Amino acid sequence: MKAWKNTQANAVIAPPKAWDKAVPFGWNSWGALQFNLTYPKALEVSDFYKENLQSHHFVNSDNLVYTGLDSGWNSFSEEELKAFVDRCKANGQIAGVYWTPFTDWAKNPEREIKEIPGYKYKDVYLYANGKPQELDGAYAVDPTHPAIEAMMKRTSELFHRAGFEYVKMDFMTHGAMEADKWYNPEIQTGIQGYNYGMQLLDKYFGDMYINLSISPVFPAHYAQSRRIACDAWNKMKDTEYTLNALSYGWWQDKVYQFNDPDHIVLRDATDGENRARVTSGVITGIFIAGDDFSKGGSKEVKEKAMKYLTNAEINAIANGESFHPVDGNGEKSENQFVRMDKDGKAYYAVFNYMDQELKMTTALERLGLDSSKEYRLKELWSGIESTAKTNLEVTVPACDVVIFKVEE
């Protein structure tokens, strides 16, 4: 009963995938560059982090940054991939890469599978009522087919030769889709097929940090982290979307090592939206930025990065442990989140999704604090200090956030 109450019953049976390092801070190319990703731009972003962010508090407690290539990396030669990894290492970074193991984006049934001569893609699709299963513009493939394992082996060998240590595995739900049948006759459900495929993924990629995206929640023990809100960008609606997922999914950092709030994008947003989006990241889990920091990227977004990604006290919050909502019975997205740390400090964040100022009063006991004691507060974006006893009076500007460090 105690494990269930602490949201850890599943973790007792299937513990999270091991990870003895700090929560990842970093960059992912899909936030802005997307298919405009090139080898020179990737090097420039790595250099920008080294020269401008890593020495200004944008590093995890291991003093590392994870610099990730998303979709589009396959335009690089193998030599360029290796050189990118080497540049990252020289810059005090871990290189990351991307793959979608359970999809066929070409949707060309007659295409030959080069990993296993004699097979075509039509041989590995998952079929429902005789038709290929399609989702998000891609056909789903059978995780139990030997050709899919051959692809995993080949891709893993490339990633390891290049030296990648982090991989984002995307569109994983395709591997869990239901089908008329699977290559392995013992598989009878989509999740059984997905679990089979994840065992293979662990076999070939298990020594890398694995981050899942667009994936089933369970089974959870094959990856260190899972994205809880996909395609969250820069606006307040993206922050609200992320925090809606955190409201109901905060507990997933008990079955994964960390939650993933998606890339933090700063471009074309107000100062308040920037503060809110960064805060939504640090209170959720891994802390990955996504703007174009190459030489061709805008001066404005680089200035924003220097302003909003380098707040030492904000960044120190990001230890990988998710905040949880203060309330859970609202009709709209929750906007108050709290975390109690082992050293006795509490953190309390209030988001304002609206276009007008928000004023509210919060009872300290609702935050798990002793209402008979007086607490010292510091709002970490403004640096303003105050005290509170019994209740906390909060004012949040339109489309903005405040986050307090609370100590006795």
Residue spans for each PLM region:
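C-terminal beta-strand-rich structural cap/linker in extracellular carbohydrate-active enzymes
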Residues: 387-408
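Glycan-recognition surfaces
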Residues: 112-146, 150, 192-299
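Carbohydrate-binding surface patches
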Residues: 281-284, 289, 328-369
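Active-site groove signature of glycoside hydrolases
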Residues: 59-71, 152-181
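Solvent-exposed beta-hairpin/edge-strand motifs
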Residues: 366-383
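The substrate-binding groove and active-site-proximal loops of carbohydrate-active enzymes
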Residues: 25-40, 68-78, 134-150, 177-191
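Carbohydrate-recognition beta-sandwich/jelly-roll modules
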Residues: 1-57, 91
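Acidic/aromatic-lined carbohydrate-recognition and catalytic surfaces
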Residues: 62-126, 201-207, 212
